[in-house]
Amino acid sequence: MFCPFCRHPDSRVIDSRTSDDGLSIRRRRQCPECGRRFSTTETASLSVIKRSGVVEPFSREKIVLGVRKACQGRPVTDSDLAVLAQKVEETIRSTGASQIEANDIGLAILPELRELDEVAYLRFASVYQAFDSLEDFESAIQQLRVEHRGEPADVQV
């Protein structure tokens, strides 16, 4: 690590701490040449492979933007969306992969969004899973009833 002050090619780590979100490490360093101290932040890179084959860096903001559309008009705050995006990123990073398919991000969003707001979940799932008919919605609603409310599976919508 080059010293940003004197450009010496080496530095000594004085202190390392995990960031609040647990996704990066903050290191306090000291240059052995000039003695000045500086901080660095280290994160593991994560790339997304889109359906078209294009590879781009992972972006929490894109998750928030996509989910915000599904939450429009719902009692979901920006803070809720930020927490959801953080949980999704943690889930993805826990796989240890440096590249992930865009489809896998959507799969990681669905359970978190279902916990946050069921209506927003249905909206997001209808686009993400390409619902084609009312039966697709009925099936998703039925699944929500069974999983979250303990109702029998044969209840009509």
Curated annotation (Swiss-Prot):
GO molecular function: ATP binding; DNA binding; zinc ion binding
CC cofactor note: Binds 1 zinc ion.
Segments forming a coiled coil: none
Limits of the ATP-cone domain: 46-136
Keywords: ATP-binding, DNA-binding, Metal-binding, Nucleotide-binding, Repressor, Transcription, Transcription regulation, Zinc, Zinc-finger
Domain of life (superkingdom): Bacteria
GO terms of biological process kind: negative regulation of DNA-templated transcription
InterPro entries attached to this UniProt entry: ATP-cone_dom, NrdR-like_N, RNR_NrdR-like
Disulfide bridge partners, by residue number: none
Cofactor(s), names only, from the UniProt record: Zn(2+)
unnamed Zn finger ranges: 3-34
Database matches in HAMAP family: NrdR
Record function comment: Negatively regulates transcription of bacterial ribonucleotide reductase nrd genes and operons by binding to NrdR-boxes.
Protein family (similarity comment): Belongs to the NrdR family.
Protein name: Transcriptional repressor NrdR
Native organism taxonomy: Bacteria, Bacillati, Actinomycetota, Actinomycetes, Micrococcales
